[in-house]
Amino acid sequence: MYSLLTALSVPLLAGLAHGYANPGSCSGSCNVHDPALIVRESDGKYFRFSTGNEISYASASSINGPWTAIGSVVPAGSKIDLSGNTDLWAPDLSYVDGTYYCLYSVSTFGSQDSAIGVASSTTMELNTWTDHGSVGVASSSSKNYNAIDGNLLVDGSSYYLQFGSFWGDIYQVKMASPLKTAGSASYNIAYNATGTHSEEGSYLFKYGSYYYLFFSSGTCCGYDTSRPAQGEEYKIMVCRSTSATGGFVDKNGNACTESGGTIVLASHGTVYGPGGQGVYDDPTYGPVLYYHYVDTTIGYADDQKLFGWNTIDFSSGWPVV
């Protein structure tokens, strides 16, 4: 979820909690940025996707690993005719009617000239992916949003695409299928009114009677050359609603469209800047929050970021790791 670097607004820091669990174990190939996780229906094999190398991906027998690198989803680059179409970002995986869909973003750092594309495969094996190009969501400087960081929610027979990074922050649009929008207008579902609007990387997850909108906020990248003030680095936040299409509020009742958001996971111990998250209902561990983070004992460079995961406790109605 590359974006403009910025500071997290002071209002969003309210409610910061401590005592987070350390990340679960990871062995094998554990360096990732913006991970996406899915398990193959036919055999239970785990697949993990990441920003870079035309969407790199790896497989393992469990979420712990050992992770083995496979290759790239779109090795020739996206057919979307925009700068950045050979350096794809922010994968998101879904499974619909026997087919796996991998969303990706085409953009360049700090630009609104962006689009969300999709590739599909029935097996997720190397060289089986078909690139379909744009899903119909794109942006330029004339838009209120930046069309990156797509996330598809499959809710029964309905499909919703969450997307956005900075500018107008998080938007949603109805999809006709995992491949194309329904042609309706997009609408804002989360917005930080302060600073340069540091929200991105949304992930909408249904659990029980609520839809939980997870997102990353703060400065994401480049920590090896310049680190933000304490508390202004990446962190994972959430709002919830009984509707998939809006009305998201934080734990204090603040609207997510009015700078609301409850912190789920922030820097702690040797874990720094967790973000780029998703949620998966694991058959062994139950709901799991996965993300990338910096291990401060290893290094702060983007290519040193690691795959992290924690189980989520929803018993209070709010996610706790």
Curated annotation (Swiss-Prot):
Activity as a function of temperature: Optimum temperature is 50 degrees Celsius.
EC number from the UniProt entry: 3.2.1.99
Site residues by UniProt (Important for catalytic activity, responsible for pKa modulation of the active site Glu and correct orientation of both the proton donor and substrate): D149
GO cellular component: extracellular region
Pathway, per record: Glycan metabolism; L-arabinan degradation
One Pfam family from the record: Glyco_hydro_43
Substrates-to-products reaction catalysed: Endohydrolysis of (1->5)-alpha-arabinofuranosidic linkages in (1->5)-arabinans
Keyword Transcription regulation part of the UniProt annotation: no
Record's signal peptide: 1-19
Keyword flag Signal: yes
InterPro entries linked: GH43_arabinanases, Glyco_hydro_43, Glyco_hydro_43_endo_a_Ara-ase, Glyco_hydro_beta-prop_sf
Keyword entries, A-Z: Carbohydrate metabolism, Glycoprotein, Glycosidase, Hydrolase, Polysaccharide degradation, Secreted, Signal, Xylan degradation
Active site per the UniProt annotation: D34, E200
Gene Ontology molecular function: any one: arabinan endo-1,5-alpha-L-arabinosidase activity
Single GO biological process annotation from the record: arabinan catabolic process
Residues modified by glycosylation: N192
Main localisation: secreted
Cell compartment(s), UniProt: Secreted
Effect of pH on activity: Optimum pH is 5.5. Stable between pH 5.5 and 6.5.
Family: Belongs to the glycosyl hydrolase 43 family.
Protein task: Endo-1,5-alpha-L-arabinanase involved in degradation of pectin. Its preferred substrate is linear 1,5-alpha-L-arabinan.
Entry protein name: Arabinan endo-1,5-alpha-L-arabinosidase A
Lineage summary: Eukaryota, Fungi, Dikarya, Ascomycota, Pezizomycotina
